[in-house]
Amino acid sequence: MIELRNLSQRFPGPTGWVDALHNVNLTIPQGEVFGIIGRSGAGKSTLVRTINLLTRPTEGNVVVGGRDLTLLPAGALREARREIGMIFQHFNLLSSRTVFDNVALPLELAGAGRADIEAAVLPLLDLVGLSAQKDRYPAQISGGQKQRVGIARALASKPKVLLSDEATSALDPETTRSILDLLKRINRELGLTIVLITHQMEVIKQVCDRVAVLDAGRVVEEGRVIDVFLQPHHEVTRALIGDVIAQELPPALKARVAERLKTGSGHLLRLAFTGSGVDQPILSETIRRYELDFNILHGQIDEIQGQAFGSLAVLAGGEPGKVGQALAFLREQGVVVEELSYVE
């Protein structure tokens, strides 16, 4: 288990002290995939680096596996850090070493013998799907394969926790999905706790059990991923989820929708369905009852934490009174309705 207690981090700036983190409190159970999301500059990377004390917090405590890392002497802290692996956006591989030797590096530094190194590294290469590339150099493999080397290297010391700091942000969408699938498999097969930093809500949706939303160094929302997607409370969370919708709309359509919103001639709605509501004709029933025009802009059906989850972005038009009645009816049917004021 990871516990962050009253964590604050201040850095000196050109005009005074800057609060990168402010009174952060989080509890992450063993074996969970926990996401931390926020805009650029929200404090995500600072937060994840406090977990292994790469960045020592100005105030507060970091408890990992029952030990308060902030109280440990240097030698004990080095030992504790061996139980915390980390992967980064940049792969940080040594170009003069093969795939095998890059993965073996932490074990060599720990003084392991060659036989022990081979016994540890070969299964890891098999786990990440790189057995056939073990004798290649970083320049001879793809970006996704380089990140797999980074993951295997982070697992070499048999950590209980894996920290991922924007590990997929430099990868293409298909490679990102394959890396996230690998992280889920590692979590499932090794029982590893994974803390994943990202600015992409799609990444959170694909792999995480729970999520915390960070803004200006503060946790503004936290909960199960399915709950946060269905009913986001904070404006930052709503904007991040709205980005998932907006990114799917062609630029010309975004412009037309934005113009209609300015003139007040339409209502941009996000409708979220879960469970049995996904395959029910709720929308068509609403149109018939209240004589509305629904222009479907974007829709998808996905699965989050084993539950069917449907999301629609629609532009609704009709008499104002009937629009209000229709939204009330949708909510009565268990549909989560959010009226969006803009599309970027």
Curated annotation (Swiss-Prot):
Localisation per UniProt entry: Cell inner membrane
Gene3D superfamilies listed in its UniProt record: 3.30.70.260, P-loop containing nucleotide triphosphate hydrolases
Keywords: Amino-acid transport, ATP-binding, Cell inner membrane, Cell membrane, Membrane, Nucleotide-binding, Translocase, Transport
Broad class of the protein's primary localization: membrane
Membrane topology: Peripheral membrane protein
Known role: Part of the ABC transporter complex MetNIQ involved in methionine import. Responsible for energy coupling to the transport system.
UniProt name for this protein: Methionine import ATP-binding protein MetN 1
